[in-house]
Amino acid sequence: MLLIDIKKQLGDLLLDVKLSLPSSGISAIFGRSGAGKSSLANVISGLTSPEEGRITLNNRVLFDSESKVSMPPEKRNIGYVFQDARLFPHYKVEGNLLYGCGGKRTPHFNDVVKLLDIESLLTRYPHSLSGGEKQRVAIGRAILSEPALLIMDEPLASLDLPRKHEVMPYLERLAKEIKIPILYVSHSLDEILRLADNMVLLNQGSVSLSGDITSVWGSPLMRPWLNASEHSALLEGTISELHSDHPMTKVTLNNSQQGIWVKSPCDCVEEGKKIRLRIRANDVSLIKQQPQHSSIRNILPVVIEDLSEDKENDVVAVKLNLSGHVLWANITLWARDELQLGIGQSWFAQIKGVSVTQSDLCSK
C-alpha cells in the first residue's frame, strides 16, 4: 500500500495531500491543469521533496521529515513513464530496454517485448520511432526494472489522436496482465474509463475525493469538473446474453439481477466477460409508469436519491438508485416541477440501447 501525508509549497499552490492507495490495480490521479497531479507524482518518486510529511510504500519509508529520511529516486524502486519518452538516443531500442533490467536479457525481457509488441523495433534507434512506439519502449523499460510501483504521468498527452489509439490497447493489456500497481496521472476521462480501478480527484493541491472508480465517478463532487455532455455514471457488470437476431448485448450489473441492453462491443462479445459501461446523464429520461410499447430498450426501475438544481443552465441533476448502483439523469427545471419529483419516489429510467457507444464500453 502507498501511504502519503505531505505538504509542499509550489508557488501560490500548497500541495497538501493525505492519501492511501492499494498495492494492486491502476489508481488514476485526475484533475485540471495546475491541480498538482504531476507535482504529486514527482514527490512520490523522489524527484522533488516535500517540506514536511511522510511517504511509505509497502511499509518501506521513502520520506519522513521528522526522522530526516529522504530516499533518493534510484533507491525507491519506482518506475516512471513521462509525457515524453526520454529514451537514450545513442542506444537502440534493445539497449534502452536492457538498461531497465540491468543489462541482462531474461525470460521477463521476452515477455515484456511480446506484451508491448516491440520485437520488430529492437534494432532501431529512438529517432526513427513514432511517438507511440517511443512510449511503448519507455513503458517496457520501466516495467523491466521490476518496480514496486509504476508511475505514468500523462503518457499519451504528447501524442496525436492516431498515436493515442495505437498505444491505448497496450495500456489496457498492461492493466490486465502485469501485477505491478500503477499510478496513472491524467486529465482524460476516456483514458481513466478504460484503465483505472481506483480514482483520486485532486483540486488545487488537495484530495477532494478518492475511492473505487465507480463511486468517485458517480459522486456529485465530480459534476463541477465535467461539462454537460460528460455528466455520467459508470456501471460494471458481466455479459449475460447475446441477442440471437440483432447486434445487441445484455450486461447484468454486479451484485444485481438488473440487465442493460447495449450495442454489441466489437472486442468483447462473449458471455461471462466483465465489462464497464458509461451511461451519460443526458441519455437518461424518467417516466412514472412503464410503457407497454416503446422503442427504448432499457426501462429500468429506479428510486430518486437526490436532486441538484442548476438554475443558470436550467438543469436538475437527478441521482438515481438502480439496484444499488448510481445512475444520473439530467432534466429541465420545468420537467422537475411538472412531475413534482421528490427524494424517495419510485420511477422508471429510460436508456436507449444505441446511446451507449463503443467509446462508452470497455472490457475489464
Swiss-Prot record:
Signal peptide span: none
Residues annotated to bind ATP: 31-38
Disulfide topology: none
Localisation per UniProt entry: Cell inner membrane
Broad class of where this protein is predominantly found: membrane
Membrane topology, as annotated: Peripheral membrane protein
Domain Mop: 293-360
E.C. number(s) listed in UniProt: 7.3.2.5
Gene3D superfamilies xrefs: 2.40.50.100, P-loop containing nucleotide triphosphate hydrolases (3.40.50.300)
Quaternary structure, from the entry: The complex is composed of two ATP-binding proteins (ModC), two transmembrane proteins (ModB) and a solute-binding protein (ModA).
Protein name: Molybdenum import ATP-binding protein ModC
